[in-house]
Amino acid sequence: GMCCGAGGARMWMEESIGTKVNDERAREAISTGASRVATACPFCYIGKRKLEKAIQRLPDSEGIVLEWKSFQLNPSLQTDPNQNTLTYLAETKGWTMEQTLQMTAQVTAMGKEEGLNFNFEKTAVANTKRSHRLLHLAKAYDCQNELKEQLFKVYFEEGKNIDDLETLLQCAEHAGIPQAEAKKVLDTHGFEEEIDQDVYESRLIGVQGVPFFVFDRKYGISGAQPDEVFDRTLQQALDEVK
């Protein structure tokens, strides 16, 4: 999988706009308003904010339900709190540090436009599997969006390790998940099947990168697209429901 952005940060992304999902099986696999995101992808944070703003701009946003699905860009990634994203990107992408700084500066500027403050110097390398366990638990407490926001915030803006138990429990508490429940899920490798199912569904509908947003089971937006793409696609999906 890859991260999807827009504009200058092209090496980090792939994109296709307003895709119509035609495959019947694939459509059955997608719930209304499902968003596939990786917890440690900057474009997912930007895309989340763009989607929220697009929903706010709608004249009638009553009844819109958001559901977050899991997608791991690198499932085998080893957590290393001592390595920051800059050195990790340079090593894995084969970029010079100058290229890496240029790339992350573009992403930081994109984030600024949405009111987000990326801090790639502080962001540590972390496996996100445990954060996805919590994301599935959050569904039961109707606080997926709050948890997702919290995970993005502590990871990208505060440089916290999102594979760390304390950090995850703090995020869970902030979102409204009881500590005992959160701890149990993290201790027992909960929601393994659900995470695998999300990944399977992603493959079924041909998701190449994240974020990938699906509206009303048939319209897809790949990447942190321009606002008008979100506006147009949301409106299109809503018009068909009415």
Please place each PLM-identified region on the residue numbering.
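Short glycine-/small-residue-rich flexible loop motifs, especially phosphate/cofactor-binding loops
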Residues: 1, 26, 87, 108, ...
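C-terminal cap of thioredoxin/glutaredoxin-like
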Residues: 46-64, 136-242
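Structural alpha/beta surface segment adjacent to cysteine/selenocysteine redox centers
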Residues: 50-155
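Short, basic/glycine-rich phosphate-binding loops at helix/coil junctions
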Residues: 2-8, 112-113, 176-178
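A non-catalytic, amphipathic alpha-helix used as a structural packing/dimerization or gating element
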Residues: 20, 24, 28, 46, ...
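Cofactor-cradling patches in redox/metallo enzymes
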Residues: 1-42
